Amino acid sequence: MRPEGSLTYRVPERLRQGFCGVGRAAQALVCASAKEGTAFRMEAVQEGAAGVESEQAALGEEAVLLLDDIMAEVEVVAEEEGLVERREEAQRAQQAVPGPGPMTPESAPEELLAVQVELEPVNAQARKAFSRQREKMERRRKPHLDRRGAVIQSVPGFWANVIANHPQMSALITDEDEDMLSYMVSLEVGEEKHPVHLCKIMLFFRSNPYFQNKVITKEYLVNITEYRASHSTPIEWYPDYEVEAYRRRHHNSSLNFFNWFSDHNFAGSNKIAEILCKDLWRNPLQYYKRMKPPEEGTETSGDSQLLS
């Protein structure tokens, strides 16, 4: 019998078997490596060892992910059992005490307060579980996002292409904006949930004739209805372009990419921030158009056909 009030931590059978499977595979791999080492020359053993280490590292990464799953589900099981026990105790206490009489307008506020007090720990538990799950998924997404970023940097003008071909952004971009964007090598979007929901947009540039900044950061506070400007990196225009930047900013008072880029508090700029955070960052490839390679025996023209 387990002590009263203690919790049983059950590891789900699916995860336990998967974790054991990883352990058996790693053990078999090491044993096989040892046997092969007696049959080959030292050079072959050294080459094989590198492969074994690589396989063991891969198995180790899988084991870590499985362990994350196990710990997450163990915590959920423990929390669920604790919640069940608390509910049972509350039910026993309610059965021992005579039930309340008919609800009246005078007694309703007290009853609502009692219910709210019971609800608070449940809400706190839900927030913790959601936060752990979000952090876990962010860890899993990161290597894929890093790999995607490395591939994108090998494609010249990728982000200029993507932004210019977005159905809403295309109407807000001029030819000069497009040229400025051609120097952009990377885009990163990050989100923070605590203490406030914050969306951070980082635009990375190589050397260009417009400004000195290598990174432009724009931050927005996010709520249910809107993105609200919070902070932006001041743009360090080159002296040769500063007058033109001032002219462009004051010549056109309508919403466009340049006004968003140069003036963080420009009216309506939250629309562009929302497009970048919620659409372009999540799947830029859907807006990228590739140049169609010229067919053999044909001359390449300036207006090469685009492929979706």
Curated annotation (Swiss-Prot):
Belongs to the nucleosome assembly protein (NAP) family. Keywords: Cytoplasm, Developmental protein, Differentiation, Gonadal differentiation, Nucleus, Phosphoprotein, Spermatogenesis. The lineage of its organism: Eukaryota, Metazoa, Chordata, Craniata, Vertebrata. The keyword Cell division does not apply. This is Testis-specific Y-encoded protein 1. May be involved in sperm differentiation and proliferation. It is linked to TSPY is located in the gonadoblastoma critical region and is preferentially expressed in tumor germ cells of gonadoblastoma specimens. Expression also correlates with testicular seminoma and tumorigenesis of the prostate gland. It is found in: Cytoplasm; Nucleus. Specifically expressed in testicular tissues. Isoform 1 and isoform 2 are expressed in spermatogonia and spermatocytes. Found in early testicular carcinoma in situ, spermatogonial cells in testicular tissues of 46,X,Y female and in prostate cancer cell lines. The keyword Cytoplasm applies. The gene is TSPY1. Induction: Up-regulated by androgen in a prostate cancer cell line. GO terms for cellular component: chromatin; cytoplasm; nucleus. One of its GO terms (molecular function) is chromatin binding. InterPro entries: NAP-like_sf (IPR037231), NAP_family (IPR002164). GO terms for biological process: cell differentiation; gonadal mesoderm development; nucleosome assembly; sex differentiation; spermatogenesis. Phosphorylated.
